[in-house]
């Protein structure tokens, strides 16, 4: 990677290419933005991210475009932007109506993007949102804490966290790792058709935060991460 080293950046993929940007090097926040072409094994710098330089944002690829939003630049944020790889242009879109946040996780199912978890000024975020690109609007879903009088969410308080990761298998999303600030290994499965979460088997690796994740076929993968001063390189 030819850009400056950094942590807490974001990435997404669109049309079989990878895109990477933002982040923090301990002194400076970044807003530069890069494209990786696996066929040529080359990085190309693209148009800078138009929001403030930041870290701990969230990102996803959706309908041949990429999205980056929320994060932290010294203040908590919830602004959102869409990137079109065809012309390397950015456009600001409407933000969700809920909390600002850093360290959220996002996933895409059936061309709908979902954003949940994170941290906002001393509180772990409980609101949960989906973005429909055809309507260009955010829709609020059920909270990820025990806020209703019904029994379905009695255990939901263990969903909230910051720096968790998610991946999608067969139309369902899986959330694991992260912390509150105690590190978590409990894992949850989300079914969008009924807007419900179900607790599943715990993550078997060492507890960690700031991990990366992806899915391939019928399996999900969690890689790297940290616990206090220890850094992981297992998968």
Stretches with model-predicted labels:
Residues 1-235:
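Kelch-like beta-propeller repeat domains
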């Amino acid at each position: 990677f030819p850009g400056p080293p950094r942590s807490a950046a974001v990435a997404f993929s669109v049309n079989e290419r990878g895109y990477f940007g933002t982040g923090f090097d301990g002194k400076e926040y970044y807003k530069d933005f890069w494209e990786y072409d696996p066929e040529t094994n080359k990085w190309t710098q693209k148009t800078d991210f138009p929001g403030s330089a930041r870290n701990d944002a969230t990102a996803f690829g959706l309908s041949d475009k990429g999205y980056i939003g929320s994060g932290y630049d010294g203040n908590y944020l919830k602004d959102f932007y869409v990137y079109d790889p065809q012309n390397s242009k950015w456009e600001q879109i409407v933000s969700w109506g809920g909390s600002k946040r850093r360290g959220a996780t996002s996933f895409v199912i059936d061309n709908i993007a979902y954003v949940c978890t994170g941290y906002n000024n001393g509180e772990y975020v409980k609101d949960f949102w989906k973005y429909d690109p055809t309507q260009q609007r955010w829709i609020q879903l059920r909270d990820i804490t025990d806020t209703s009088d019904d029994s379905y969410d009695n255990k939901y308080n263990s969903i909230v966290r910051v720096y968790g990761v998610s991946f999608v298998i067969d139309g369902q999303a899986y959330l694991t790792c992260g912390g509150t600030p105690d590190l978590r290994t409990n894992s949850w499965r989300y079914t969008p058709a009924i807007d419900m979460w179900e607790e599943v088997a715990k993550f078997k690796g060492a507890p960690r935060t700031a991990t990366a994740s992806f899915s391939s076929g019928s399996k999900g993968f969690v890689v790297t991460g940290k616990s206090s001063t220890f850094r992981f390189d297992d998968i």
